Amino acid sequence: MKPISIKDSWIGLDESGKGDYFGPLVVAGVQVDTELSARLTAWGVKDSKRLSDKRILDLEPMIRQACPHSIVAIGPERYNELYAKIQNLNKLLAWAHARTLENLLSERASPRAIADQFGDERFIKNALLEKGRQIALEQRPQAEEDPAVAAASILARAEFLKRLKRLSEEHQMDLPKGASDRVREAAVRLVRETSAEALKKVAKWHFKTTQQVLEASRPR
């Protein structure tokens, strides 16, 4: 990892798994300077939603090696515990963004950070700790257009994909991405073959999908 210019640097933050019923919520932070930003663009780094899973997994080690970064992954069980306490997805997201930023700033300084805007912009600022409060935090729509944020989206999605694969292997069944009919069918099968409690270990319980799955799983 080549040393970067701290004065000329900024941090990009993004998350993955927010809309996926199965799997964790992951937030990543990536620090770049002007030179690194140009290199990421040359590699084809862009919003992970515009890339295939294969391309995401190909780019991930390149970004990890080139850029200072931090990743906070909240597995389904922990996610469900936190949501039960916080009762607000945007506040939970803000907490994870703040932890990611604080972890990265504990290793190296940076004057500013950029994150996608979700909910009240005070959510992240209120969740920041000492180091995070000392930098300029910009929250804006479509922040993934910035190379640092795009790189963070790739690291977050790659971590999500790897953890979802491990959950699928542990439960010996395919746990699909998203929140589609296929996802509901997999969840119903899991409940019927195991229990509703098992669902809490792999899924985000507060999704409306849960009630649909539990109703469909009841004996007829």
Annotate each PLM feature.
Residues M1-R220:
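RNase H-like, Mg2+-dependent phosphodiesterase core
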